[in-house]
C-alpha cells in the first residue's frame, strides 16, 4: 500500500507541473510581425534619434546607417520575441535585444554599453 500511495503522489506532481508549464507557456505569446511593424525611432542616450520603418517582412528601412553608429553593426532585420525585439545584422546574428517596457517602447544596451530606446512613432 505505501508504494501505491507514493505512485499516486508522483502522478499528482507530474499533473500539477504539466498544468503549470502549459499555463506559463501560453502567457508568453510572441507578437506577430504585422502587430509590431510600423514607423519606429531609435535613440541612444544623448545622441539623437534615427527613424525608419520596421516592415512586416522583418526588414528595417530608413536611416539604418545612423543606428549602426550606436550598435556597432548594421541592423537589417528584426524579430519579435515574447519580451521584446531582436535587431539582427545581414548574417542573421543578433546585434542587441531590446526589452519591452510598455506598448510601443523597447529599451536595451548596445555592445559598447550605451542605452538605446526604440519607440513606435505612429
From Swiss-Prot:
Keyword GTP-binding: no
Subcellular location, record wording: Periplasm
Record InterPro entries: Inh, Inh/Omp19, Protease_inh_b-brl_dom
Pfam families: Inh (PF02974)
GO molecular function: metalloendopeptidase inhibitor activity
UniProt keyword Lipid biosynthesis, yes or no: no
Principal location class: periplasm
Region (Disordered): 101-122
UniProt record similarity statement: Belongs to the protease inhibitor I38 family.
Protein name according to UniProt: Alkaline proteinase inhibitor
Organism: Pseudomonas tolaasii
Native organism taxonomy: Bacteria, Pseudomonadati, Pseudomonadota, Gammaproteobacteria, Pseudomonadales
